[in-house]
Every structure is written in structure tokens, then in C-alpha cells.
């Protein structure tokens, strides 16, 4: 499950003339002690994106997880693309969060880079159905148009692929239009991406999930050296 999403991203990154970045073997594929859970990771880079990572967690019929985050280069004030998709097999429940995560919360910035998510939300209104404000701080690195789904197998089978494809294609099209930086310079962009990683390091709910499957030692290394690598950067 979700392998088609990985393949879709790889195809689009390839069209950007992106290349795969070699990562440590312990991150590329890692099994828990009884091999019931397997995590696989990929890292890519291109002229537009300094880091585009993909994570797949296979827990068999019990749990399936897909995550991807795309960081633009420091010369682009574009938001960060972020997607978390989880399928809980026992309860037949889908949880999905898709967003163009803004570097700042200024209204004109949000309108320029994130508002086109609104048309996707409208088209797939049955998929976008829960604000979950108790989990995500909308005043930080989430746009007003964040797509959040607490769904079922119908949403998984009928909607997920289409909405994910639209979500990624629209984001890439925004970048292809070569938007001129209006709000941040290169130094400010880097600082805000560092702040994003620090915030995510503290708040990402996947931390507990990974610890329960793969242990605290591996998870700490994975988060610092693969997921949020700017977390240890010092902001001057």
C-alpha cells in the first residue's frame, strides 16, 4: 500500500532532473526486532529542491504509513510541501494531512503560495473533513487551507490517489511559474527552514510511533540525521 504514491513522486522528481542522494543503510531500510515493521526511506535533490524525502512504514495489515516533505532551496521562499498519510487496518481508518507549509503567516504570502489548495479542498470536500486543531497549531507552519482527512476505506480507495496527485502537481506548477521572492531574502528563508525543523522536531507526533516500533536510540538518530537535519543548526 502507498507504493504507487512513492512511484508517482519518483517520476515527478525525475522530471525535475532530480537525483537520489545516498543515505545510511540503517535509514534506507530498517526492521524492528521481530520484522513485523519495516521502514524504507528515500532522499532526493534537484536544482529547485535542496531536499525531498520520502518515508514508507509497512506494518502489514495493522498499519501503513506514507510521509513526504519537500524543502525548496534557500533562494526560494516557496512553502514546504508536507504530507502524512496513515492507514489503520484493524479499525479501517484513514488519517491524512496535506499542506503547503508556509514559512511565514503573512496574509499576502499565504494567498500567493498556499491559497490554490482551496480549490483542491473544494473539489474533494468529502475527503477534507476534520480540522484537528487539537493536534496541529494553525498559527505555526500550517496554512489556512491545510487538507485533513479522518476517513475510511472509501476515502482511501476513491479519493486518495487523485487528491495526492493534484496536491503535488499544483505545488510543482507554482514553482514552475518562477515566482519572484517578495517576502523573504535567502538568509531569512534559511532561518525559517531551520525554525521549521526545530518546530517539527519538538511537535511531530510520529516520534512516539517510531519509538514504539524501533526503539528510542534509532529513532533519535533517524529524526536528527534524516527527518529534520536542520534541527541542530544554530540561528545567529
Swiss-Prot record:
Enzyme Commission code(s) on record: 1.3.7.2
Enzyme class, UniProt record, top EC level: oxidoreductase
Keyword Oxidoreductase: yes
Keyword NAD: no
GO molecular function annotation: 15,16-dihydrobiliverdin:ferredoxin oxidoreductase activity; cobalt ion binding
Gene Ontology biological-process annotations: phytochromobilin biosynthetic process
Gene3D superfamilies noted in UniProt: 3.40.1500.20
Reactions mediated catalytically: 15,16-dihydrobiliverdin + oxidized 2[4Fe-4S]-[ferredoxin] = biliverdin IXalpha + reduced 2[4Fe-4S]-[ferredoxin] + 2 H(+)
Keywords: Oxidoreductase
Family: Belongs to the HY2 family.
Protein role: Catalyzes the two-electron reduction of biliverdin IX-alpha at the C15 methine bridge.
Stored HAMAP family: PebA
Protein name: 15,16-dihydrobiliverdin:ferredoxin oxidoreductase
Amino acid at each position: 500500500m502507498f507504493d504507487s504514491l512513492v512511484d508517482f513522486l519518483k517520476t515527478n522528481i525525475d522530471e525535475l532532473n532530480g537525483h537520489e542522494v545516498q543515505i545510511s543503510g540503517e535509514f534506507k531500510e530498517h526492521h524492528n526486532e521481530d520484522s513485523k515493521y519495516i521502514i524504507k526511506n528515500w532522499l532526493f535533490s534537484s536544482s529547485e529542491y535542496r531536499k525531498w524525502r520520502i518515508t514508507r512504514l509497512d506494518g502489514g495489515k495493522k498499519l501503513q504509513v506514507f510521509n513526504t516533505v519537500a524543502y525548496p532551496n534557500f533562494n526560494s521562499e516557496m512553502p514546504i510541501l508536507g504530507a502524512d498519510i496513515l492507514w489503520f487496518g484493524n479499525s479501517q481508518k484513514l488519517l491524512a494531512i496535506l499542506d503547503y507549509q508556509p514559512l511565514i503567516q503573512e496574509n499576502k504570502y499565504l494567498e500567493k503560495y498556499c491559497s490554490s489548495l482551496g480549490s483542491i479542498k473544494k473539489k474533494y470536500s468529502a475527503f477534507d473533513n476534520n480540522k484537528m486543531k487539537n493536534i496541529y497549531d494553525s498559527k505555526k507552519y500550517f496554512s489556512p487551507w491545510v487538507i485533513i482527512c479522518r476517513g475510511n476505506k472509501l476515502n482511501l480507495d476513491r479519493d486518495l490517489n487523485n487528491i495526492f496527485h493534484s496536491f503535488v502537481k499544483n505545488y510543482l506548477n507554482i514553482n514552475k511559474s518562477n515566482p519572484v521572492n517578495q517576502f523573504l531574502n535567502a538568509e531569512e528563508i534559511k532561518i525559517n527552514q531551520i525554525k521549521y525543523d526545530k518546530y517539527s522536531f519538538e511537535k511531530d507526533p510520529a516520534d512516539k510511533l517510531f519509538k514504539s516500533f524501533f526503539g528510542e536510540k534509532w529513532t533519535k538518530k533517524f529524526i536528527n540525521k534524516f527527518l529534520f537535519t536542520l534541527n541542530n543548526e544554530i540561528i545567529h
